[in-house]
């Protein structure tokens, strides 16, 4: 499983409230950055002794300075990707936009009140709208796999604190058989933490979210605060390793226009089958 991270899960799961929720509703914009390093990048950045060890010490990986990583990311053929996403939140609506290359050529709008997901491509003047029924149809086309036995996850406090982007954060470590994560959480974003259970419930009801391990990771972290910085080291047996850094760079509370969450009326609406063909690399 590719570890998507509790920050991403938190944002997608945790920013909407039903009309009966008691927590203060968040409205505003959250800006995030995700940096992913592959084997080649790690070999360029780590000391030779660390690379020659039978198993790379994740602490050496987590200690790599961000400025060195970003400097290397600016060079060609470096095995590093830097993606940024902007999450705009209003009530039960969520708009996701950003720079993630070919993976997201436009933006997405999730309306949990209406129970719809829209993937919008302005360059082509089109969008795809999916409902819970569409997600169920898509999932029925994928063969079910046997559930894997996984170790019980626990969030272990590391007793470390530091300021990250103006927020006071504490560190917690979570380890599975395939990855280890150190997540820095803050208690200063309580309205985001209070909301995540409702959004998770809405996503699961729509059939959009079934990564139970990511859900469990965020639930463990949310007991202590909202994740601001997450460092994850993944190992793939003989197939190498990967290092992911996901960071909340800015949280801005402000009123947002309803137009931001509406698809232009002249855009063409495509079918689910058109979406599946696009995912398979076929043009319309």
What annotation goes with each model-predicted range?
Residues 5, 19, 32-33:
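N-terminal compositionally biased, intrinsically disordered segments and leader/signal-like regions
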Residues 23-284:
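Extended soluble regions of mature proteins
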Residues 10, 22-23:
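Low-complexity, intrinsically disordered segments with a bias for serine/threonine
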Residues 8-16:
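Bacterial N-terminal signal peptides
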């Amino acid at each position: 499983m590719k570890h998507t991270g509790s920050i991403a899960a938190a944002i997608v799961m945790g920013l909407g409230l039903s009309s009966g929720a008691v927590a203060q509703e968040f409205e505003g914009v959250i800006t995030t950055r995700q940096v992913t390093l592959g084997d080649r990048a790690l070999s360029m950045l780590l000391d030779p002794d660390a690379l020659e060890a039978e198993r790379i010490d994740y602490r050496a990986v987590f200690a790599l300075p961000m400025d060195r990583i970003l400097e290397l990311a600016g060079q060609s053929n470096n095995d590093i990707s830097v993606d940024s996403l902007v999450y705009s939140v209003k009530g039960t609506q969520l708009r996701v936009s950003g720079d993630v290359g070919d993976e997201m050529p436009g933006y997405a709008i999730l309306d949990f009140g209406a129970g719809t997901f829209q993937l919008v491509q302005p360059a082509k003047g089109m969008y795809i709208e999916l409902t819970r029924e569409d997600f169920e149809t898509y999932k029925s086309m994928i063969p079910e796999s046997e559930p894997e036995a996984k170790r019980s996850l626990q969030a272990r406090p590391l007793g470390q604190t530091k300021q990250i982007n103006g927020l006071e954060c504490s560190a917690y470590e979570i380890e599975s058989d395939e990855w280890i994560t150190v997540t820095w959480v803050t208690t200063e974003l309580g309205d985001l933490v209070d909301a995540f259970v409702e959004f998770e419930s809405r996503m699961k009801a729509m059939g959009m979210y079934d990564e139970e391990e990511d859900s469990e990771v965020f639930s463990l972290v949310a007991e202590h605060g909202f994740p601001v910085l997450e460092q994850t080291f993944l190992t793939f047996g003989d197939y190498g390793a990967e290092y992911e850094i996901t960071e909340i760079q800015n949280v801005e509370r402000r009123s947002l226009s309803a137009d931001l969450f509406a698809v232009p009326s002249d855009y063409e609406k495509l079918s689910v089958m058109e979406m599946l063909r696009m995912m398979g690399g076929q043009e319309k």
